[in-house]
């Protein structure tokens, strides 16, 4: 099992690395072709694509009458996206935040606060429908109000949109399959080393559903595509709440997770306050990363 686990682990890592790079490259070229900003692509196409694991996991968990896993996966992934994904991305490449991005972050913050308020007593199917509708409205608003910052000489030399779309799809498949193999391989290694199921579930499964966002955002950060990173994080969080959590609540009532929601609100508020200064730099990234580690340690101790 150990050898098989190492093989899955390494193959998953390779697919994650190249898949995320192709996904970002295809997304960037499509953004230029359709004259939309990197943020819009990040908040829509990339966010929905990388949030598929969370949406499917939460929906299936609710269907199988495991509400704690359903809501924990959705909210935990949101915390991971800000603390780990955005934190590491900002450390690699500081993110410049213009007025338009600040407005998007404010909308995101209000969405999170609204979700926290209606979820004080848990999430019913009515709450799920409301969040799902707000998610759809957000997507339309983002696309409609997104303004691109395109250089004039980019259009002529770009490959065709079909090639870019194929690159995007292959990259997304690589990321999703790679994440599954990576986590499965890590589980096999852990079991072979007699690590408990509880530790495996708490660490690897929770981290695994956020791997697509992490790898895609790091690939974008290496290309200095800060808007795409921010769009992916914000869009993924809205998709996790308005998609994963909302769909999960349609199958059964989800319990309140006020501590996790409070952590998410605080981290989202810090994100907005940092963005007001027009830059999320390395020190902010280190702070987000530290807060994520503290939050995970506190939740585990609780």
Curated annotation (Swiss-Prot):
Subcellular location: Cell membrane
Pfam families found in the cross-reference section: Na_Ca_ex
GO biological process: calcium ion transmembrane transport; intracellular calcium ion homeostasis
GO molecular function: calcium channel activity; calcium, potassium:sodium antiporter activity
Gene Ontology annotations for the cellular component aspect, listed alphabetically: plasma membrane
Transmembrane portions of the chain: 3-23, 39-59, 77-97, 106-126, 128-148, 163-183, 199-219, 227-247, 254-274
InterPro entries, sorted: K/Na/Ca-exchanger (IPR004481), NaCa_Exmemb (IPR004837), NCX_ion-bd_dom_sf (IPR044880)
Matching Gene3D superfamilies: NCX, central ion-binding region
Keywords annotated in UniProt: Cell membrane, Membrane, Transmembrane, Transmembrane helix
Record's bilayer topology term: Multi-pass membrane protein
Family per record: Belongs to the Ca(2+):cation antiporter (CaCA) (TC 2.A.19) family.
Entry protein name: Uncharacterized membrane protein MJ0091
Organism expressing this protein natively: Methanocaldococcus jannaschii (strain ATCC 43067 / DSM 2661 / JAL-1 / JCM 10045 / NBRC 100440) (Methanococcus jannaschii)
Lineage, top ranks: Archaea, Methanobacteriati, Methanobacteriota, Methanomada group, Methanococci
């Amino acid at each position: 099992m150990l050898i098989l686990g190492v093989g899955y682990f390494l193959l998953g890592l390779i697919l994650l690395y190249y898949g995320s790079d192709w996904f970002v490259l295809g997304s960037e070229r499509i953004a230029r072709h359709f004259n939309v900003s990197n943020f819009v692509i990040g908040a829509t196409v990339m966010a929905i694509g990388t949030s598929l694991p969370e949406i499917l996991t939460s929906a299936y968990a609710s269907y199988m009458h495991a509400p704690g896993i359903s809501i924990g996966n959705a909210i935990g992934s949101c915390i991971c996206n800000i603390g780990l994904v955005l934190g590491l991305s900002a450390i690699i490449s500081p993110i410049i935040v213009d007025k338009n991005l600040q407005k998007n972050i404010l909308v995101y913050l209000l969405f999170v606060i609204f979700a926290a308020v209606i979820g004080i007593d848990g999430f019913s199917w009515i709450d799920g429908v409301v969040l799902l509708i707000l998610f759809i409205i957000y997507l339309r608003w983002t696309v409609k109000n997104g303004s691109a910052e395109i250089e004039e000489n980019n259009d002529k030399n770009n490959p065709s949109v079909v090639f870019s779309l194929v690159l995007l799809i292959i990259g997304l498949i690589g990321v999703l399959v790679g994440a599954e193999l990576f986590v499965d391989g890590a589980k096999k290694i852990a079991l072979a080393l007699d690590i408990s199921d509880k530790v495996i579930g708490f660490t690897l499964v929770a981290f695994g559903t956020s791997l697509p966002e992490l790898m895609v955002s790091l690939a974008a950060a290496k290309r200095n595509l800060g808007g795409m990173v921010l769009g992916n994080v914000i869009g993924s969080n809205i998709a996790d709440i308005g998609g994963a959590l909302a769909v999960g609540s349609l199958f059964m009532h989800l319990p309140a997770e006020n501590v996790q929601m409070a952590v998410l609100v605080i981290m989202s508020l810090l994100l907005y306050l940092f963005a007001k200064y027009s830059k999320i730099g390395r020190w902010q990234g280190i702070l987000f990363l530290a807060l994520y580690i503290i939050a995970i340690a506190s939740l585990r101790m609780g």
